[in-house]
From Swiss-Prot:
Name of the molecule in the record: Ubiquitin carboxyl-terminal hydrolase isozyme L3
Gene source species: Rattus norvegicus (Rat)
Modified sites of kind Phosphoserine: S130
Higher taxonomy: Eukaryota, Metazoa, Chordata, Craniata, Vertebrata
Domain spans labelled UCH catalytic: 5-229
EC number: 3.4.19.12
Role of this protein: Deubiquitinating enzyme (DUB) that controls levels of cellular ubiquitin through processing of ubiquitin precursors and ubiquitinated proteins. Thiol protease that recognizes and hydrolyzes a peptide bond at the C-terminal glycine of either ubiquitin or NEDD8. Has a 10-fold preference for Arg and Lys at position P3, and exhibits a preference towards 'Lys-48'-linked ubiquitin chains. Deubiquitinates ENAC in apical compartments, thereby regulating apical membrane recycling.
Cellular component GO terms held in the UniProt record: cytoplasm
Marked site: Transition state stabilizer: Q89
Record text on subunit structure and interactions: Preferentially binds diubiquitin; the interaction does not hydrolyze diubiquitin but, in vitro, inhibits the hydrolyzing activity on other substrates.
């Protein structure tokens, strides 16, 4: 039996900020556009930045790389701090919402939540769960599903049919305990991309984004947004 399928979210700060507001996040942190990967364009992004979301196309080249990366990490191992909040993706097209959850969950101490926040409740209930259990919890969490659905209709482009196959995917890049982690619910575990800091997170995350673009030089469908202090 096929699992749940949601409408995809746009990588649009207006949509993501409204979505988080509806889930009870105080707007002291806001998503902003990253207009380009060059230093002068990155200098326009308000600091500090605590997370970057990348929207990218799932291509054959990427899927080959993903398989190779997974096998390499399984054979060589990697260090992942237990402080990382990571969840699997079991709902089709929910990668935008999962990216937002990854961004907020790994910066929870910096965030302010309104009383009765559905997102805060979800994070508190799932803090001790496994990545798979968190995925199942999201499947049954109506407050987030309904808000996602509303937000998917609020983008600048018309939302596709719920049955349409979408080949764009969101990941979150976050700083936890001195390291930069790529969080992708399609992958079996977080990916440690090396050292980072609150001050250098944006630049370090963009270096990871550039590698995605270099793997698919013929593709133009890349978009990054940063979670910045408002």
């Amino acid at each position: 039996m096929e699992g749940q399928r949601w409408l995809p979210l746009e990588a649009n700060p207006e949509v993501t900020n409204q979505f988080l507001k509806q889930l009870g996040l105080h707007p002291n942190w806001q998503f902003v556009d990253v207009y380009g990967m060059e230093p002068e364009l990155l200098s326009m992004v308000p600091r500090p930045v605590c997370a970057v979301l990348l929207l990218f196309p799932i291509t054959e080249k990427y899927e080959v790389f993903r398989t190779e990366e997974e096998e390499k990490i399984k054979s060589q191992g990697q260090d992942v701090t237990s402080s990382v909040y990571f969840m699997k993706q079991t709902i089709s097209n929910a990668c935008g919402t999962i990216g937002l959850i990854h961004a907020i969950a790994n910066n929870k101490d910096k965030m302010h939540f309104e009383s009765g926040s559905a997102l805060k409740k979800f994070l508190e209930e799932s803090v001790a769960m496994s990545p798979e259990e968190r995925a199942r919890h999201l499947e049954n969490y109506d407050a987030i599903r309904v808000t996602h659905e509303t937000s998917a209709h609020e983008g600048q482009t018309e939302a596709p049919s719920i049955d349409e196959k979408v080949d764009l995917h969101f990941i979150a890049l976050v700083h936890v305990d001195g390291h930069l982690y790529e969080l992708d619910g399609r992958k079996p575990f977080p990916i440690n991309h090396g050292k980072t800091s609150d001050e250098t997170l944006l630049e370090d995350a963009i270096e990871v984004c550039k590698k995605f673009m270099e793997r698919d030089p013929d593709e133009l469908r890349f978009n990054a947004i940063a979670l910045s202090a408002a």
